[in-house]
Amino acid sequence: NVGKSSLINALVNHKNLAKTSGRPGKTQLINHFLINNEWYLVDLPGFGYAKVPKTIRAEFHDMISQYLLNRTNLMCLFVLIDVRHKPQSIDQEFMHWLAEKTIPFVMIFTKADKLGKVELAKNIGSYKVEMKKTWEELPEIFVTSAEKKTGTTEIVNLIESLNPQFKEII
């Protein structure tokens, strides 16, 4: 469980906007949240591990792929990664797919409060080393804790910087 819903709630300073669960795969639909009557934050089902049958996971994959490929006003996708884990091939493959399809994205490491500073730096470094094997330039990286609201200001600043661009394309 990477903590997507918890991060959404922390970003918009609303405890129960997105339903949270300790169970991976809780988000099974595309949920649109209109924020301040100005912009949408969209919560997609997780692309990776979920405690659901393989057929449902395949449906998630197709639904997410179609959404991302056909969403012309998508300004930036947030790829959330639980910083406690070593680089996962599914995350790497997904980010390569995004790059191939020219879908703009940033990496957001979640649950930073669960690690000490040394282990946190080591785990992020492992991702960077792995990605530099095939990437010329790494995507922008954010390090967050929804519980402590670490990194949320930086993400909100990114969203605000994208909003003028969003208004131009709608």
What function would you assign to each model-found segment?
Residues 62-139:
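Conserved C-terminal guanine-recognition region of P-loop GTPase G domains, centered on the G4
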